[in-house]
Amino acid sequence: MKNSKIYILVFTSFCIIIGFVYLKFDFPERTQKPKTGQELSKMYCASCHLYPEPKVLPQHIWKNTLLPEMKNRMGLGDQKSIVSKIGYDEYINLAEKGVYAISPMLSHEEWLLIEKFYIDNSPSTSSPQTTKAKNHLQTSSVELLKNLDQKQGLTTYFGVHDHQLMTSNVLGQLKVTDLVTKKKHSVQLPSPVVQIKTNSVLCIGGNMNPTQKKLGSLHEFDADFKNQQLIIDKLHRPVDFEHVDLNNDSIKDYLIAEFGNYTGQISVVDGKSKERKIIATNPGARNFVLRDVNNDGQMDFYALTTQARERISLFINDGNANFKETIILDFPPHHGSSFFLLADLNNDGKEELIMANGDNADYSIVKKSFHGIRIFENQKKTWKEVYFFPILWSHKSFRDRFES
């Protein structure tokens, strides 16, 4: 009993001493100044993507569209308003995936500081694009080809494969014209066609509008494009694919860019078993470039991600369709990344990266001075921008010769 009293006395004395020391000395935590709107914005706004400076967009865009959406994502918005807009089931699904925070990520006072920082430091109007340099292509003669048979206004695919001209519209009708015999036929598919490679046809699912529903599908046709079989369905708004052996079984697999909406992914469908493997889980997967980068005989690939954290990544294959991602170029969320390709433009034996960034259909619809075509060179394993040509709403870049 006596020992117990001694222990209690010692413990009490220890607590009193610790309390005295805490009150006597100024610890950094107790004297830390309140964070500014700029500091808070860098803390929270850079947690999901590259940090956007206020100056990149005009004040009315920040105030009327971007800041309200940021507020909703951080759990400070009116949940009833969000639910009425996207539906209860969709809201719960997105909250579970971390798109919308159910509990506030910061205090209301902190949010007001962020809001004020962006509004006070953003320009009243967007910056104009720089004057374009004159080139011979601007004075060349281009013949416009009109598809007079296409009654539906929204064309989702246009391409020539061997001697067949193929078009598709928003209704999911695939029209095939033999350029030799001039014979035509059409095939009805579940949804609009967005990509065709060899005899494989990719359908986006739904009606082209953004959705979380997984309605996309991949179909394999015969040589005449009359009969087809379903390869895989329940794809999340797929927009591009490659048909290539990724696991060394001599059977081609399907590498699919499931663009999605709030969520999305890059997936591989085994050509033999048709089993699906998820390679990356980010929205906005746009297109691929296949390359054996390290010359080990395994097919690697580059991929462009155009939503949230916009970037171009290199995925190295271990030979069994397991990939390691390395981000080679990172872009802010307002960049508008749209498409990319690799090509040796200056005949030096090394490929340059050509990129179009002009997507302007989300929360910041305004003319942007930084939209256009960019060229990056691989300089000592680092990609550096060496050329920019401003073009509003640029969505795709090509490298070819247009000569008679």
Place the predicted regions along the sequence by residue.
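Beta-propeller-forming repeat regions
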Residues: 30-39, 43-404
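Aromatic-capped interface at the extracytoplasmic side
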Residues: 25-28
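Hydrophobic membrane-insertion alpha-helices, especially the h-region
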Residues: 9-22
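Positively charged n-region of N-terminal signal peptides that target proteins for export
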Residues: 1-6, 241
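Compositionally biased regions
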Residues: 4-5, 14, 32, 128
